[in-house]
Amino acid sequence: MEQEIDQIVQAITIASDPTQASLYQQALAYISTIQQNANETWRLALHIFVDQNTEGHRKHPAQARFFALRVLDEFFDNRFEPLDHESFQAIHQALTAYIQSEYVVGSAEADASFLRNKFSHTLTLFFLCTYIDQWPSFFTDLFTLIRPTESATRSNFNRHISLLFFHIVLEISGEVADQIIKSARPYNAARHARDARVRDAVRDRDAARINAAVLTIVVEGAEQMANLHKSETSSRGPRELEGAVEVVDWGIRTFGSYVGWIDINLTVTPTTVPLLFNLLADSSLPIRLATSVSLLRIVSKGLKEPGDKLQLLKVLSLGQVLDALEAKTRAQQIEREESYREALGKLLNVLGLELAKLVDDCSDEDIRAEASTYITQIQPVMLRFMADEYDDTCSTVFPLLQNILTTYKRHRKISSNPLDESKRSFLASLLQVLLAKMKWEEDADPEDADEDDNAEFDKMRKELRTFLDSILAIDQVLVTDAVKTLALDTITAFKNGVSIKWNDAELGVYLVFIFGEINKSMTRIAGGKGRAAFCQAPAVVDKDKRKATDYSDYPLTTHGEMLLALVQSGVASFPHRTVSLQFFETASRYTDFFKIRKDCIIPTLEAMIDTRGLHNENLNFRSRLFYLFHRFIKESRNEIPPHISGNIIDSMRDLLLIEVEIPAAEDTEIDPLSEAIKNSQFDSQLYLFETAGILTSLLCKTPTQQTAMLLSLVKPLMDDLSVSLQAFSKGGQDLLPIVKVHHIIMALGNIAKGFPDYPTSIPEGHILPPLEIFTEVAQAILVCLEAMNVYKPIRDATRFAFARILATTGPTVTSYIPQLMGNLLAHFEPTELVDFMNFIGLLIHKLQKDMFDVLDQLIGPLSAHITSLLTQPVSGTDEHRAHIETKRAYLALLNNIMASKLDGIFTSERNSSNFEVLLESMQRLAEDVSDPASEKTAIMFLNRSVTVWGQPSSSENGRETGHGLPGFERFIYERLVQTCFRVPSLPQFNLKDGQMMVVLHEIANLLQVICKIRGHEAYNFFISVFLPSQNWPSETALDFMTKLRDLDGKGFRKYFTELIRSSRTS
């Protein structure tokens, strides 16, 4: 055995030293085998842990002994039956001797304190295996060791054994009663039953003695602490005080660990309650925190009788205690002790929730009334915790507050009586606390703060908003008056020159910002959305008279008054960017207000454009303003006088310069071009280009001026584009010209995006934008694409820009599409396929029949490529996702073609040879139940196919682009009908799956379309050929055909679903 032990110890030493590379892995594998075979190796482990040398010291190093405990853990942890007698005796004697030598007379592993915690866990596992049948005297034996035999000792109890006892009880509580620990490991019925038996046995045999021992040691430790505090000059020094604090701390933790699973009459007594309250106010923070947890567990302990629970809470009188402690700690504000106030808040929260359970669940009216009174009594202290400057403390009472407000809302719904004064007073006080908590700290700096800090503040504001919304549902006037008063008082004070702190100003503006949200119900009552939210206009204004109506004649709503005061106050000039940013956020959110108070537009625009906004020195601030300015202009464009749009553009020209910097490569695995393209500042700048396009579009009634303005925006970009293309053509590795071309193409696309879409039918008197300029832009972009089509970012930018130019110019640039497609497909990555098909779908939507020739050339190669792609095997999650996305985009494209009546491309001279292959591909996808969404879309395509090509070949039924195809009926009867009945019969077709039900409904639609298009012929086929071949009884077949012919779509879908469901269960 000695040789084996030495071998294990040597392996552990090697495994603890990764520098021994040659033997490291071998040693790890060896000791892993030792641990896995704990049933055979536990004796070796026991010796390694307890053996001593001739001098009485532990024989083996600490890391070896720690590993030995892990082996013993493995041996005990998987054992749910008693040990054999010989094994039990060997372990019992060894561990008892170890405790005697190390804890009773020794230093309790002073040189390796981590072994203490590990040993207490191992001993606990041994206890769980043996307590019921083999070591029932476990606690009795332990208690005899706690009191030292030497009467000269200053302490009555052995400190080491006391702490070991505490740790063991804590471990036992964790193993047999802690639901968090239990839920964290896989359920094991044998373990669950064993733990329940141990828990019951401890309750019956030793619970009272354990509790008495814990409290006795705690009381002695507390007395010792008090004596040491009195004699601060004692030579015993702080070490003894530290030791006493540790004992009391662990003792109270132990007490708190078992109060939830032993008799409450043991833990809540005339002795324990005063002790706990004394310790709750102790000078030691760890003791106070441990005591608060113990009290929390007492309060939350479940009792069968509501009366008993109420009596428990009355005995504790926690409300009064917490009131006093909250006031005391708030006055002291001791640094680093905020965790104590947080613990007190949690305790109050649980107390309130337990009382609320009595109010909600108890049938005894007296108990409910008394519990409700107690909740009312603790509301003031709850509000004081809510007002705490630390968010962690404030949020401890959120669940209780939510419960109280939910109760108020519930009563409000069932009663039309006014809210009683006490509740209204509480809500008014709460409202003031909430508004104060929504404010930034004065010394905070949102601009320089960590993103996580700002996110936490925003999260807190949102949570406070939910409470505000709850009060709103209870007493709307109370909330709106409070918010309005605080916002207007702050704004007015600033306007009048009163010195306002930045955080007060920001809150005032923020309240105007959220008023539209918290006041939704009032705006609905007043007439709803839009202008009606800001002025008291008639509920109905004749549609023809709306444009001529002067809404400024109508009085403002409350929100309208707040916004008017906000604009007129000049708060946009507040010398703190957080305040001015909040102003701009508010202005851009409520643009409908500016439609009724047009005199507010110019001052707001001025603030947005000058150094308060777009031209602010702070880069991040400017970036956000680019978006807000764009939003304001876009939503208010019809209210902006066209004659000032040129001035606005001129004032922002310096911001339209495109500057490119190539970042230094930090990671060789990242594509440097993609990294250079990613630029959040440029992404924000694109909003300005679109805004410039919007402002230029406003000059539509003066075409010459509009052309000049558009040219002044586009020409510098086109010149820059030419210079960058020439630089690229010279060769070299410089990424700058490529990035510059990308950015310019994106900018040109965004300018086009600012113009309205080309009309489907041009109305009389409509003035088109300068199409010739956009044509030149399209040509220039194509030249760049042809030269740079090997670069994906250039292809992406071109696709975007062309989509926007086509939306603006309509068929004007259609002639460039073949060249565009050729260059986009010249170099193609699989990831671009979905974007490309979506792009084609957009062109179809915009250009309709003008896309026929392009699609005629494109659809054949594209279908062949995708069909090949979809038949390839898939490996990996990412590849599977890409496969599905490609399939869905392809099916969407095909359906777009059919919906736009461009179906002729599938049967054209160029593509007719592939038509049957396409139909077979669609049929396969329609039968693939592994992807119901794609399956449904494929059936939709087949549905449309029947409508177009399945018509009887007669001149009266023909149509120019969708006449029937001779022979298509064979495909319908031989293939599609089979599919309609094969799919629902597949074993994988799950009728309980909502997506599968959608597929089934689409199949029902297809059956009806077939019969509608083919008429009597189809009915004869079903009744005479298909259904008999499927062995349908003639009555069932006749019923099916009758329903298919006579029911509407909804009725037949319901019938067909029930038919399939019954056929699968029969």
From Swiss-Prot:
A GO CC term attached to the entry: nuclear matrix
GO-annotated biological processes: tRNA processing; tRNA re-export from nucleus
Protein origin, superkingdom: Eukaryota
Pfam families per record: Exportin-T (PF19282), Xpo1 (PF08389)
Compartments where found: Nucleus; Cytoplasm
Keywords, alphabetical: Cytoplasm, Nucleus, RNA-binding, Transport, tRNA processing, tRNA-binding
Single GO MF descriptor: small GTPase binding
Keyword Lipoprotein: no
Family annotation (InterPro entries): ARM-like, ARM-type_fold, Exportin-1/Importin-b-like, Exportin-T_C, XPOT
Primary site of residence: nucleus
PANTHER family referenced in this protein's UniProt entry, alphabetically: EXPORTIN-T (PTHR15952:SF11), EXPORTIN-T/LOS1 (PTHR15952)
Protein family (similarity comment): Belongs to the exportin family.
Function: tRNA nucleus export receptor which facilitates tRNA translocation across the nuclear pore complex. Involved in pre-tRNA splicing, probably by affecting the interaction of pre-tRNA with splicing endonuclease.
Protein name: Exportin-T
Organism per entry: Laccaria bicolor (strain S238N-H82 / ATCC MYA-4686) (Bicoloured deceiver)
Lineage, opening ranks: Eukaryota, Fungi, Dikarya, Basidiomycota, Agaricomycotina
